[in-house]
Protein backbone atom coordinates (compact mmCIF):
# COMPACT_ATOMS: atom_id res chain seq x y z
CA UNK A 1 0.00 0.00 0.00
CA UNK A 2 1.52 3.23 1.26
CA UNK A 3 5.09 1.93 1.57
CA UNK A 4 4.97 0.37 -1.89
CA UNK A 5 3.74 3.61 -3.47
CA UNK A 6 6.40 5.73 -1.79
CA UNK A 7 9.16 3.22 -2.47
CA UNK A 8 8.23 3.10 -6.15
CA UNK A 9 8.01 6.90 -6.21
CA UNK A 10 11.54 7.22 -4.82
CA UNK A 11 12.93 4.74 -7.35
CA UNK A 12 11.17 6.55 -10.20
CA UNK A 13 12.49 9.91 -8.98
CA UNK A 14 16.02 8.46 -8.91
CA UNK A 15 15.61 7.20 -12.49
CA UNK A 16 14.26 10.59 -13.57
CA UNK A 17 17.24 12.28 -11.91
CA UNK A 18 19.79 9.99 -13.57
CA UNK A 19 18.29 10.45 -17.04
CA UNK A 20 17.61 14.18 -16.70
CA UNK A 21 19.39 16.32 -19.32
CA UNK A 22 19.33 19.43 -17.10
CA UNK A 23 22.20 18.65 -14.74
CA UNK A 24 20.29 19.59 -11.60
CA UNK A 25 22.04 19.10 -8.25
CA UNK A 26 20.93 16.55 -5.67
CA UNK A 27 19.57 19.37 -3.50
CA UNK A 28 17.77 21.16 -6.33
CA UNK A 29 17.65 24.93 -6.90
CA UNK A 30 14.90 25.38 -4.27
CA UNK A 31 15.81 22.48 -1.99
CA UNK A 32 13.35 20.37 -3.99
CA UNK A 33 15.78 17.93 -5.61
CA UNK A 34 16.21 14.19 -5.24
CA UNK A 35 17.98 14.31 -1.86
CA UNK A 36 15.27 16.32 -0.03
CA UNK A 37 12.60 14.14 -1.68
CA UNK A 38 14.39 11.01 -0.47
CA UNK A 39 14.56 12.42 3.07
CA UNK A 40 10.84 13.26 3.03
CA UNK A 41 9.91 9.80 1.77
CA UNK A 42 12.16 7.97 4.25
CA UNK A 43 10.77 10.11 7.08
CA UNK A 44 7.20 9.30 5.99
CA UNK A 45 8.00 5.58 5.82
CA UNK A 46 9.59 5.67 9.26
CA UNK A 47 6.61 7.47 10.79
CA UNK A 48 4.17 5.09 9.10
CA UNK A 49 6.06 2.05 10.38
CA UNK A 50 6.88 3.12 13.92
CA UNK A 51 4.97 6.30 14.75
CA UNK A 52 1.52 6.88 16.21
CA UNK A 53 -0.49 9.91 17.27
CA UNK A 54 -0.41 10.67 20.99
CA UNK A 55 -1.99 13.40 23.06
CA UNK A 56 1.43 14.60 24.22
CA UNK A 57 2.36 15.28 20.60
CA UNK A 58 -0.78 17.37 20.27
CA UNK A 59 0.20 19.33 23.39
CA UNK A 60 3.66 20.05 21.98
CA UNK A 61 2.12 21.01 18.65
CA UNK A 62 -0.31 23.33 20.43
CA UNK A 63 2.58 25.07 22.18
CA UNK A 64 4.48 25.39 18.90
CA UNK A 65 1.46 26.84 17.10
CA UNK A 66 0.85 29.28 19.95
CA UNK A 67 4.42 30.61 19.80
CA UNK A 68 4.36 30.87 16.00
CA UNK A 69 1.01 32.65 15.97
CA UNK A 70 1.99 34.97 18.84
CA UNK A 71 4.90 36.19 16.71
CA UNK A 72 2.52 36.52 13.74
CA UNK A 73 0.11 38.63 15.81
CA UNK A 74 2.95 40.98 16.78
CA UNK A 75 3.87 41.31 13.11
CA UNK A 76 0.24 41.96 12.16
CA UNK A 77 0.24 44.73 14.77
CA UNK A 78 3.12 46.40 12.95
CA UNK A 79 6.13 45.06 14.87
CA UNK A 80 9.17 43.39 13.30
CA UNK A 81 10.50 41.07 16.05
CA UNK A 82 12.35 38.65 13.75
CA UNK A 83 13.58 41.28 11.27
CA UNK A 84 11.74 39.59 8.41
CA UNK A 85 11.02 42.94 6.77
CA UNK A 86 13.39 45.60 5.45
CA UNK A 87 14.36 48.29 7.94
CA UNK A 88 11.54 50.77 8.42
CA UNK A 89 8.83 48.53 6.95
CA UNK A 90 6.34 46.06 8.36
CA UNK A 91 4.15 43.19 7.17
CA UNK A 92 1.81 45.53 5.31
CA UNK A 93 4.59 46.70 3.00
CA UNK A 94 4.49 43.32 1.23
CA UNK A 95 3.94 43.73 -2.49
CA UNK A 96 4.25 47.51 -2.20
CA UNK A 97 7.75 48.27 -0.89
CA UNK A 98 9.28 44.80 -1.10
CA UNK A 99 8.50 41.51 -2.84
CA UNK A 100 7.17 38.51 -0.97
CA UNK A 101 4.96 38.10 2.08
CA UNK A 102 6.38 36.88 5.40
CA UNK A 103 4.77 36.10 8.73
CA UNK A 104 5.30 34.05 11.89
CA UNK A 105 8.35 31.96 12.69
CA UNK A 106 8.20 30.18 9.32
CA UNK A 107 8.41 33.33 7.21
CA UNK A 108 6.74 32.67 3.86
CA UNK A 109 2.97 32.99 4.27
CA UNK A 110 2.35 30.06 1.91
CA UNK A 111 4.49 27.80 4.09
CA UNK A 112 2.81 29.17 7.20
CA UNK A 113 -0.59 28.39 5.69
CA UNK A 114 0.54 24.84 4.88
CA UNK A 115 1.78 24.30 8.43
CA UNK A 116 -1.44 25.63 9.94
CA UNK A 117 -3.48 23.41 7.61
CA UNK A 118 -1.77 20.46 9.28
CA UNK A 119 -1.79 21.82 12.81
CA UNK A 120 -5.22 23.41 13.28
CA UNK A 121 -7.38 20.42 12.24
CA UNK A 122 -5.17 18.02 14.20
CA UNK A 123 -5.49 20.15 17.35
CA UNK A 124 -9.23 20.73 16.96
CA UNK A 125 -9.95 17.05 16.31
CA UNK A 126 -7.82 15.92 19.25
CA UNK A 127 -9.68 18.35 21.51
CA UNK A 128 -13.06 17.16 20.22
CA UNK A 129 -12.22 13.47 20.60
CA UNK A 130 -10.38 13.60 23.93
CA UNK A 131 -12.24 16.50 25.57
CA UNK A 132 -11.34 17.05 29.23
CA UNK A 133 -7.81 18.34 29.62
CA UNK A 134 -7.30 18.52 25.83
CA UNK A 135 -10.04 21.10 25.27
CA UNK A 136 -7.50 23.92 25.58
CA UNK A 137 -6.10 22.82 22.22
CA UNK A 138 -9.06 24.57 20.62
CA UNK A 139 -7.40 27.89 21.51
CA UNK A 140 -4.24 27.46 19.39
CA UNK A 141 -6.38 25.89 16.66
CA UNK A 142 -8.63 28.96 16.57
CA UNK A 143 -5.63 31.30 16.76
CA UNK A 144 -3.99 29.49 13.84
CA UNK A 145 -7.16 29.72 11.76
CA UNK A 146 -7.39 33.45 12.51
CA UNK A 147 -3.76 34.02 11.49
CA UNK A 148 -4.38 32.07 8.27
CA UNK A 149 -7.29 34.36 7.46
CA UNK A 150 -5.46 37.57 8.40
CA UNK A 151 -2.40 36.57 6.37
CA UNK A 152 -4.64 36.13 3.31
CA UNK A 153 -3.19 32.69 2.62
CA UNK A 154 -5.78 31.57 0.08
CA UNK A 155 -4.42 28.02 -0.20
CA UNK A 156 -4.44 27.75 3.59
CA UNK A 157 -8.02 28.94 3.84
CA UNK A 158 -9.14 26.43 1.22
CA UNK A 159 -7.42 23.66 3.16
CA UNK A 160 -9.02 24.67 6.46
CA UNK A 161 -12.43 24.97 4.79
CA UNK A 162 -12.02 21.44 3.43
CA UNK A 163 -11.14 20.19 6.92
CA UNK A 164 -14.23 21.83 8.38
CA UNK A 165 -16.57 20.53 5.67
CA UNK A 166 -15.19 16.99 5.72
CA UNK A 167 -14.36 16.80 9.41
CA UNK A 168 -17.78 17.76 10.79
CA UNK A 169 -19.81 14.85 9.34
CA UNK A 170 -16.82 12.54 9.89
CA UNK A 171 -16.75 13.41 13.60
CA UNK A 172 -20.52 12.97 13.93
CA UNK A 173 -20.23 9.55 12.29
CA UNK A 174 -17.37 8.58 14.63
CA UNK A 175 -19.74 9.22 17.51
CA UNK A 176 -22.03 6.53 16.10
CA UNK A 177 -24.63 8.81 14.53
CA UNK A 178 -24.46 7.92 10.85
CA UNK A 179 -27.91 9.28 10.06
CA UNK A 180 -27.03 12.64 11.62
CA UNK A 181 -23.73 12.63 9.72
CA UNK A 182 -25.57 12.16 6.42
CA UNK A 183 -27.91 15.04 7.31
CA UNK A 184 -24.92 17.28 8.08
CA UNK A 185 -23.25 16.26 4.81
CA UNK A 186 -26.42 17.02 2.85
CA UNK A 187 -26.74 20.39 4.57
CA UNK A 188 -23.14 21.27 3.74
CA UNK A 189 -23.65 20.28 0.11
CA UNK A 190 -26.74 22.50 -0.06
CA UNK A 191 -24.84 25.44 1.46
CA UNK A 192 -21.94 25.02 -0.98
CA UNK A 193 -24.30 24.88 -3.96
CA UNK A 194 -26.21 27.93 -2.69
CA UNK A 195 -22.95 29.85 -2.22
CA UNK A 196 -21.77 28.98 -5.73
CA UNK A 197 -25.10 30.07 -7.19
CA UNK A 198 -24.85 33.37 -5.30
CA UNK A 199 -21.33 33.96 -6.59
CA UNK A 200 -22.45 33.04 -10.10
CA UNK A 201 -25.39 35.46 -9.99
CA UNK A 202 -23.90 38.43 -8.14
CA UNK A 203 -20.14 38.54 -7.73
CA UNK A 204 -18.10 41.53 -6.50
CA UNK A 205 -16.19 43.63 -9.01
CA UNK A 206 -12.78 42.25 -8.00
CA UNK A 207 -11.02 39.78 -5.77
CA UNK A 208 -11.20 36.02 -5.33
CA UNK A 209 -14.99 35.81 -5.52
CA UNK A 210 -14.96 37.77 -8.77
CA UNK A 211 -12.44 35.32 -10.23
CA UNK A 212 -14.54 32.37 -9.06
CA UNK A 213 -17.60 33.90 -10.71
CA UNK A 214 -15.70 34.35 -13.96
CA UNK A 215 -14.59 30.71 -13.86
CA UNK A 216 -18.17 29.58 -13.23
CA UNK A 217 -19.17 31.58 -16.31
CA UNK A 218 -16.46 29.83 -18.33
CA UNK A 219 -14.19 32.87 -18.56
CA UNK A 220 -10.72 31.92 -17.32
CA UNK A 221 -7.75 34.27 -17.29
CA UNK A 222 -4.13 33.42 -16.56
CA UNK A 223 -3.95 36.12 -13.89
CA UNK A 224 -6.55 34.40 -11.70
CA UNK A 225 -5.40 33.03 -8.36
CA UNK A 226 -2.36 35.32 -8.22
CA UNK A 227 -1.35 33.99 -11.66
CA UNK A 228 -1.76 30.37 -10.57
CA UNK A 229 -3.81 29.58 -13.68
CA UNK A 230 -0.92 30.71 -15.91
CA UNK A 231 1.59 28.81 -13.75
CA UNK A 232 -0.47 25.62 -13.98
CA UNK A 233 -0.51 26.05 -17.74
CA UNK A 234 3.29 26.34 -17.66
CA UNK A 235 3.50 23.12 -15.63
CA UNK A 236 1.39 21.31 -18.23
CA UNK A 237 3.62 22.69 -21.00
CA UNK A 238 6.71 21.35 -19.25
CA UNK A 239 4.98 18.00 -18.76
CA UNK A 240 4.23 17.80 -22.47
CA UNK A 241 7.95 18.23 -23.22
CA UNK A 242 8.92 15.12 -21.22
CA UNK A 243 5.73 13.22 -20.33
CA UNK A 244 7.33 9.95 -19.24
CA UNK A 245 10.31 10.82 -17.03
CA UNK A 246 9.76 14.54 -16.53
CA UNK A 247 12.65 16.94 -16.25
CA UNK A 248 13.95 15.40 -13.03
CA UNK A 249 13.37 16.31 -9.36
CA UNK A 250 13.64 20.05 -8.77
CA UNK A 251 13.88 21.08 -12.44
CA UNK A 252 10.71 23.17 -12.68
CA UNK A 253 12.61 26.34 -11.75
CA UNK A 254 15.29 25.58 -14.35
CA UNK A 255 12.85 24.87 -17.18
CA UNK A 256 10.14 27.46 -16.61
CA UNK A 257 10.28 30.59 -18.77
CA UNK A 258 7.19 32.25 -17.30
CA UNK A 259 7.64 35.72 -15.76
CA UNK A 260 5.29 38.36 -14.38
CA UNK A 261 5.88 42.08 -13.94
CA UNK A 262 3.74 44.38 -11.84
CA UNK A 263 3.99 48.14 -11.37
CA UNK A 264 2.97 49.43 -7.94
CA UNK A 265 1.65 53.02 -8.09
CA UNK A 266 1.95 53.53 -4.30
CA UNK A 267 5.71 52.99 -4.32
CA UNK A 268 6.59 53.54 -7.96
CA UNK A 269 8.36 50.17 -7.98
CA UNK A 270 8.08 47.39 -10.55
CA UNK A 271 8.32 43.83 -9.27
CA UNK A 272 9.28 40.98 -11.58
CA UNK A 273 8.50 37.44 -10.48
CA UNK A 274 9.77 34.26 -12.10
CA UNK A 275 7.46 31.23 -11.97
CA UNK A 276 9.90 28.84 -10.30
CA UNK A 277 7.29 26.68 -8.57
CA UNK A 278 4.18 24.94 -9.92
CA UNK A 279 1.97 26.12 -7.02
CA UNK A 280 0.41 22.65 -7.05
CA UNK A 281 2.30 19.64 -5.75
CA UNK A 282 0.55 17.21 -8.10
CA UNK A 283 1.42 19.32 -11.15
CA UNK A 284 4.97 19.73 -9.87
CA UNK A 285 5.30 15.94 -9.82
CA UNK A 286 3.82 15.80 -13.31
CA UNK A 287 6.38 18.27 -14.67
CA UNK A 288 9.39 16.95 -12.73
CA UNK A 289 8.70 13.19 -12.64
CA UNK A 290 6.36 12.61 -15.56
CA UNK A 291 3.00 10.82 -15.54
CA UNK A 292 4.17 7.68 -13.65
CA UNK A 293 5.66 9.80 -10.87
CA UNK A 294 2.50 11.88 -10.50
CA UNK A 295 0.32 8.76 -10.42
CA UNK A 296 2.48 7.19 -7.71
CA UNK A 297 2.31 10.41 -5.68
CA UNK A 298 -1.49 10.51 -5.94
CA UNK A 299 -1.74 6.78 -5.19
CA UNK A 300 0.12 7.32 -1.90
CA UNK A 301 -2.34 10.06 -1.00
CA UNK A 302 -5.26 7.79 -1.93
CA UNK A 303 -4.00 5.13 0.48
CA UNK A 304 -3.67 7.69 3.29
CA UNK A 305 -7.14 9.15 2.78
CA UNK A 306 -8.73 5.70 2.44
CA UNK A 307 -7.28 4.71 5.83
CA UNK A 308 -8.70 7.91 7.32
CA UNK A 309 -12.15 7.21 5.89
CA UNK A 310 -12.01 3.80 7.56
CA UNK A 311 -11.53 5.45 10.94
CA UNK A 312 -7.79 5.06 11.44
CA UNK A 313 -5.96 7.97 13.12
CA UNK A 314 -8.85 10.45 12.74
CA UNK A 315 -6.94 13.50 14.06
CA UNK A 316 -3.88 12.92 11.88
CA UNK A 317 -6.10 11.98 8.95
CA UNK A 318 -8.12 15.20 8.94
CA UNK A 319 -4.87 17.15 9.17
CA UNK A 320 -3.48 15.33 6.14
CA UNK A 321 -6.70 15.87 4.20
CA UNK A 322 -6.48 19.59 4.93
CA UNK A 323 -2.85 19.67 3.82
CA UNK A 324 -3.60 17.72 0.64
CA UNK A 325 -6.30 20.17 -0.43
CA UNK A 326 -3.95 23.06 0.37
CA UNK A 327 -1.18 21.38 -1.63
CA UNK A 328 -3.28 21.65 -4.79
CA UNK A 329 -2.68 25.41 -4.59
CA UNK A 330 0.49 25.62 -2.46
CA UNK A 331 4.19 25.79 -3.23
CA UNK A 332 5.09 22.41 -1.76
CA UNK A 333 8.41 23.35 -0.15
CA UNK A 334 9.14 21.50 3.07
CA UNK A 335 8.78 23.65 6.19
CA UNK A 336 10.35 21.28 8.74
Which role fits each region the language model picked out?
Residues 235:
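Acidic/polar, glycine-anchored loop/turn motif associated with catalytic or activation segments
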Amino acid sequence: GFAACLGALLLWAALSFILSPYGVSLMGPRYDGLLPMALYILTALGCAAYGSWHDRYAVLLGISVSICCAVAVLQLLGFNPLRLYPEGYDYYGAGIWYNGSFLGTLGNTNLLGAFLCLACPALAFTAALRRGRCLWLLLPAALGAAVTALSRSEAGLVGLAAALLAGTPYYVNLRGRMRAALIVLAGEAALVIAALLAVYAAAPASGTLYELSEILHGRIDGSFGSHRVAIWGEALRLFAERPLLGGGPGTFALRSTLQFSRFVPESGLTFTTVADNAHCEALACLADLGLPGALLYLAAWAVVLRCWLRGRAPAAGIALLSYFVQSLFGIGTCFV
